[in-house]
Amino acid sequence: MKKILILSLAMLLGITAANADALTGGVSTVGLGNKVVDANTNAPISGAQISLPKQNYSTKSDENGNFNLNANFSGNTIMSVKKDGYKPFSLTIDEHIAARPMILGIQKSNGREVVIESAMLHLGDNNFSAGSANSDQFKLKAIGPFYTKTFKMSANTLNLNNYLVIGSIIGIDTAMARSMGQNSVRNSFSSPPEVYFNGTKIAEIQLNGDNQKIKLPNNLIRADNTNEVTIQTGKNLTQHAYVDYDDIELMNLSIQSE
């Protein structure tokens, strides 16, 4: 019997924002080998690109949607799945998940997505302890404590529900993340990363996780004009001698309208 592991805990608990909810999609651990399928029809998807950015590893699904992960890693790492005509998808996996057959369900695009960033981003100051969430997986240099990107949104988005979707995020060291066993930092914790839309704070991200959706208030949208999203990492709340930014990594940022 299929055992579907819906990755919803971080999506349900990890965001403090009005009307935040969970994105459908998940991973199953049944069958022989790994497979990429259409999330709605379960039809196999060929030619999907599956990558582990930190391991510099990439492969594609065959005509039956099957693929192998011939990469060695330990601890959490982000796996990305890309296919033309489908929404960006990423998943945090470890060696235990990778050791079992996976079925990855990805969703067809509705043509209204705006891809903000598909590459891996490292925010912070490159100063983190071994107990920090996923610190053993940090391989990129930090670009600084925040990331900002501008983009355009059409006037018809005002009649839709619009979301900033974060494909995957790791490294958050909040008190909530610690209570959920996502890090082993004993004597300190950080404030949550903050999300700003057109200069207004709209959310805090409390937990590490995948496919987190943050509602964009329609009254803040600049229709047919330039809009701006900023993600700012948190700060160590027990360090008062200097500013110690929490180091986090994230991937696959997009605007999705429904």
Where do the PLM segments sit?
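Short, ordered, surface-exposed loop/turn motifs in non-cytosolic proteins
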Residues: 30-32, 39-54
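Sec-dependent N-terminal signal peptides
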Residues: 4-13
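Beta-strand-rich extracellular modules
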Residues: 37, 82-84, 232-236
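Beta-strand-rich recognition domains
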Residues: 26-29, 42, 92-258
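A short, solvent-exposed loop/turn motif at the edges and junctions
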Residues: 76, 80-100
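Beta-strand-rich domain onsets/edges
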Residues: 18-31
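Short, acidic Ser/Thr/Gly-rich low-complexity loop/linker segments typical of extracellular
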Residues: 55-68
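Hydrophobic beta-strand segments
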Residues: 48-52, 65, 79, 195
